Each structure stands twice: as structure tokens, then as C-alpha cells.
Amino acid sequence: CKETTKMRESKITRDEAFELLKKYNKDPFHIRHALTVEGVMRWYAKELGYADEEEYWGIVGLLHDIDFELYPEEHCKKAPELLKAGGVGDDMIYSICSHGYGICVDVEPVHEMEKVLFASDELTGLIWSAALMRPSKSVMDMEVSSLKKKFKDKKFAAGCSRDVIRTGAERLGWELEKLFEQTILAMRSCESDVNSFMGTYQA
């Protein structure tokens, strides 16, 4: 059920957030990941009853890895400085940094939105890697059973932490299968838009 605590509104627009992202990220892989997580977060906002906060959720997803390309060793630690300089509010900075909880920072995901980001971030990478192995190169025809096999194969997309994904599902109170199913649907919702943008993207 939806939490009763009112979520904050973003202090920057989506366009401003994207310009901020591009200021520190040029690699097409990182841009694609940011856009994918943005789309996933927007889908989850609507799915979980936070449609009025879709923009906020999306911007959190868009900016969640803002410091990773230039400062990989300081991930989620350098982010507050970059975000604050870009006009991002403290609440959003907290939410963004919370996806590194227990990995690189001690900022705990508390709100449902933060738990969704924590759970889905690594998983989108695993799903994307699995999609590239398919003839279609797409999530549109991906089934949960196929993803489960890839999840169990620790050598596949080894950089995507299974432990983080499991912990994320537990924090949400979901079974892994539900997280897989929902995140596949979320990625289907934005795949076309992300592909269209990346087809014309130039760093």
C-alpha cells in the first residue's frame, strides 16, 4: 500500500537533470543505463500508486549514477557535491545515494521509492545483458523463467550483484520472482524510447 508520508517535489526539471547527467557522463553505456533506470522508476511510480510523483521518481533514476563515470571509487560519496552544485534538493540527494547502502555508503533506503531503486538498479543491468543474448535483443519477449536461469548462472553478467538484488527484494517484502516480473514489465515500458534516443545520441 502507498505510504502516507508525502513525498517531496523535485527542485529541478527533467531537462535540467538530463543536462546535469551529461555534464559528468559521456559513455553511451552509462547514458543508456541512466535512461533505463529513469523509465523503470517512472513505471514503478505509477504501478505502486505514486503517479503524482512520477517525475520525482524518474529524476532519481536518471541521476542515480551521476558520479560513477568520473569517480567510480567514490560512487555515492562524490554524488552529493555534484548534485548540490546542480541545484538538486537534499531529499533527492538522499534518495539517490541510498542505492549504495551497504555497498559504498551508509545512507539507508527508507521510502518505498528508495527501496525500488535499490532493488531494480542492479537488476536492470542483468536484464539488459540477458536481452542482448536473445535473437530479438529485446526485453519485449523475455520471460521470467529465462531471467531466472541467467540469475542463477553466477558467471553471466558477473558484475550484477545477485546479493544486492536479493536484498532489494527482501527490503520491498517481495519474492524474487515478483521483482523479476515487475522489472521486466518496467523495462518493456521504456525500451522503445531509450532505443530511439540512443540511436541519435552523441556524447
Task: Identify the meaning behind each predicted range.
Residues M142, S146-A203:
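A structured, mid-to-C-terminal "fold-capping" secondary-structure block
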